[in-house]
Amino acid sequence: MDNLRECINRKRRLLALPDVPETSDAFLSDLRHLYMCVAFCDQHKTTGDESRFTNLELLDQDEALGAQRAFEAKHGIKGGSLGDVLDHELKKVIEFTFTSGSLYIAEQRKRKTQADSIIVCVSEGLNDFSVSHGVLDMGLVETGVNAVRDFCTQNGIPMKINQVGSTRTPTPISTCKISEQITRQINSTITERKMETVLAAIAIKPELKXTQKGCXXCKELEDENILWMDPQFCEIDESFPYRGGPYGNFLQELLLTTNDVETNGKDREEVVKXILDNKAFTVESGECIITLPDKMTCFGEQEKKRPATIDEVRTAGERFEQSVKPKTQRYGRLSDKWMELEKFIFTASKTEVDTFLSVGTERLESVGVCVGALHRATTTRIIRPMIQGGKCWGMMFKTKSKMGDTRKEGYCHAIIFGKGEDKSGQNKMTMMGKTVHWHLRVVKSKGDWMAQQLCANKSRIWQHDPELVTEGVTVLMTPFSQKIATISRWRAMRLDSMFHVSSAWHHSPACEAASAMLRKFVEIVHAINQKRDWGVVGSMEDMVKEVEEIGEHLQTACDFRVYNXCKALIQKIAVSTQ
């Protein structure tokens, strides 16, 4: 009896059903159902594996499904929903159901999901029963039902439990963490490890409903997680506490305490020394701005370009021609590494997979370098502190770039506290009475982060965003680190379109292509939500095909993230335009 109780409690927990008292109707009807299965199977206990029945009710959900699918495959039965007992002699799945209404209607109801199973219906009060298909020996069922009557009498369980129909209350099931989920799904299909089967099980199928506001995701989807990399600065041993308040003023105060600047004599370091020694900075509307009068040519500030001569234009055109031929290849093929990985996933043992997953987090370090670009062209030189975890780890600045800077080389430069490689060990300065080492780092501004966006959302880049990622692995990539975690895909969608996060990585070609598609889909979704008219050049179908094509060339974790985002939006658009 205790074992049965334990079994039911465990099962309810696995299915995320609410805890109910052991005297409640819901619990007692589960108990009666379970005992019916046990009593029925007990009649044919023989030695070894030769027993006629397998009781699926006593197995975990995944094991049971795995066993039933294997059984169906072996006997060529059409797959139905999970049954209660496997009958190896009749090669059928048996389902038991108790009903307070008509036995015939109960049987028809079960038929919808289990057309091929033998359905045994028992009335409340345990007076009569019916068996579909007419192949199962009625005597077996009768013995089972009698055993249940005795069981109820002995344990003081009422014969009639669900007078008022079903007592089940629907509960939203939250999906478990991604790796657990994948492991569980692999385990349940492990019986015949066909690649397609496993992949189909792992594929995320979000269900969406259209609402008045265009299209919003169902609440159940809140827990559907995807991989997310959070760009952050990594911690270097030398830092200053950040006391809160406007970061421009904080930086100005920090810089005003600077003296005894030493450099390794390189041009750029000398310019930084000139700025700090002359206290050439001021705060304007919250931003700290460098006011050095001379041109900082070594930081890419140039004279205004003169117009090119005809000859120069012509040679440039010839050079450009090769790259615009129609058949220029857009993506490489899947790397051998990836193919090996795929093969490994479907052939490796459980321990191998676990070891691999832990090593995998370390490997993700090489996925891409996170870039915190300020913005594109500026007419002023902005300088900002890099803040994370309440400490200032350095500062980043962007020099003026004039119009006509067609190569968009307005790089960001970071001054990082701490020793860098090579000779920069000679760079020192005293700040707030403490001597620190510093080194310069060029940060390419490939992103299209706007200055306003970064100011408005300092917490995204300049400080750790506590709301965003609660857990995850931080991988260090000096001077930046990435936090790799899983967050809800709808949150990811919102953040991605708000911050253009995809642009924060140096991309693989597939990622570039997927990001471009992502922009288009985001625009369409906005249009739908705001009830604006929208159309696409070509057809939606072509866009979807293109995304599918890109999907064949994914290599890095970031590629997968952007691709996932595209797929989610396509589904969103499809649902809201039906």
UniProtKB/Swiss-Prot annotation:
Phosphorylated on serines and threonines by host kinases. Keywords: Phosphoprotein. The keyword Phosphoprotein applies. The RNA polymerase is composed of three subunits: PB1, PB2 and PA. Implicated in endonuclease cleavage of capped RNA primers. Displays an elongation factor activity in viral RNA synthesis. Dispensable for viral transcription, but not replication. This is Polymerase acidic protein. It comes from Infectious salmon anemia virus (isolate Atlantic salmon/Norway/810/9/99) (ISAV).
